[in-house]
Regions:
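Conserved Class I S-adenosyl-L-methionine
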Residues: 159-191
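A short SAM/SAH-binding and catalytic strip from SAM-dependent methyltransferases
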Residues: 115-129
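Class I SAM-dependent methyltransferase Rossmann-like catalytic core
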Residues: 1-48
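Class I SAM-dependent methyltransferase SAM/SAH-binding core
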Residues: 54-106
């Protein structure tokens, strides 16, 4: 799949008592968009048992502690504070940590190993020049038949935007160049414009982000902060 997360998907995840309990309601993610993304990811993974799961750029993960303990969980992150992230790991018992980035081809990450990999709000921070290695490494670590789930922050306005269309094309087609395929048809309607069925960040959430990243104030003032969700298979 490749689409913008919809309100109905978010609400479905909130209505799932197991998901809501695992993420302790609204406690784990105070920000609106992160809350949407966490719940979408957790709704995909809540039934997972006995799987090898790697969070990419997990930092001090909100998802890994909420997963079934019968899974083998890994957290891949440099912990160098990139994107206002942490510089030290609050280590979780029985979770394996690899202090690297996807795209480094870290020897600690075995080939053809993971049933599931996922990232939350990571891909939009990666320079385009590094994306090829990101997808190549993501494909390397996955088992055949494994799934890669990624949620990506993006700003969408009322009118078509050529630069946005190019960025979306890169997100759609680059993984295919490295051996991935989509688990179902791409649903996103093009050109991409904001519609009221999309789950979106609150104005308060974007105001908070303005204090952290003021370079994007103009974009936030005229666009909605939403999330792409994609599911790839090897």
């Amino acid at each position: 799949m490749f689409n913008i997360i919809k309100k109905t998907e978010y609400w479905e995840a909130l209505d799932n008592k197991k998901v809501y309990s695992a993420l302790r309601g609204g406690e784990r993610a105070l920000d609106g968009l992160k809350h949407i993304q966490d719940y979408w990811i957790m709704n995909q993974l809540i039934a997972s048992k006995g799987l090898k799961i790697c969070e990419i750029g997990g930092a001090n993960s909100r998802i890994i502690p909420a997963l079934n303990p019968n899974n083998e969980c890994w957290n891949l992150d440099e912990f160098k504070g990139v994107g206002n992230g942490p510089t030290m790991a609050d280590k979780i018992e029985d979770v394996k940590y690899v202090f690297a980035n996807l795209g480094d081809f870290a020897s600690d990450l075995p080939d053809n190993y993971f049933d599931v990999s996922f990232s939350i709000s990571v891909i939009e921070h990666i320079p385009q020049s590094d994306m090829g290695n990101f997808w190549k490494d993501n494909h390397r670590i996955m088992k055949k038949g494994g799934k890669a789930l990624h949620v990506i922050d993006i700003y969408i306005g009322n009118n078509p935007n050529l630069n946005l269309e190019r960025k979306i094309d890169q997100y759609i087609y680059q993984p295919l160049e490295f051996g991935f395929s989509y688990n179902e048809e791409i649903q996103l309607k093009r050109p991409a414009v904001f519609t009221c069925d999309m789950a979106s960040n609150s104005d308060w959430g974007m105001w908070r982000w303005n204090k952290i990243s003021p370079l994007l104030v103009k974009s936030r003032s005229i666009c909605q902060s939403v999330s792409i969700a994609l599911i790839l298979k090897k």
